[in-house]
Amino acid sequence: MDISTITDAFGDVMLMQPSAGVFVAAVLAAILLGMSAFASGSEIAFFSLSPTDVAELEDEKTDADKKIQMLRDDSERTLATILITNNFVNVTIIMLLNYVFAGIVEFGPKAYWLQFLIITVILTFLLLLFGEIMPKVYARQDSLKFCRRCVGGILFARKLFWPLETILLKSGILAEKIIQKENHVLSVEDRKS
């Protein structure tokens, strides 16, 4: 790729006046990015509590501590809640930001590679940085404090996604049984050989 190809690509990009829908989509994407950060931080916070934190939770000093303990006791469902929430939010963010870029920037035929670069690579990087990496680093600093702040949101997401969680957990149990059965059959056949 030479410099003229790059120059032609940037010359084939036009900025457009954003509509009200584009502004709404951008605001929603920003709010959802916060929700993605919340879910990512929660994943680390709930599953990286130190033994000291766990001991403090067992004293159940606050209502939040009782709720955190309840979520930890059903850790598979809690993890399913967090993962479903995070995936749902991240997919929605990508769709909204695609709409935002389509409403602001028009890429001509010479700039299709630039469109791919901006929408796929840069948006993915920003989503990973602000929705995954930074929240996890922040949550790891004081996991118990983060858990206490987010336990209400996790319980709300748990109620919201209960049917999906149940399907996910049941299918996981079924897959585990199938794999165990296949491993048993293989080990019996290995013994005969």
Question: Model regions: which residues?
Answer:
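Membrane-embedded alpha-helical segments of inner-membrane proteins
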Residues: 1-191
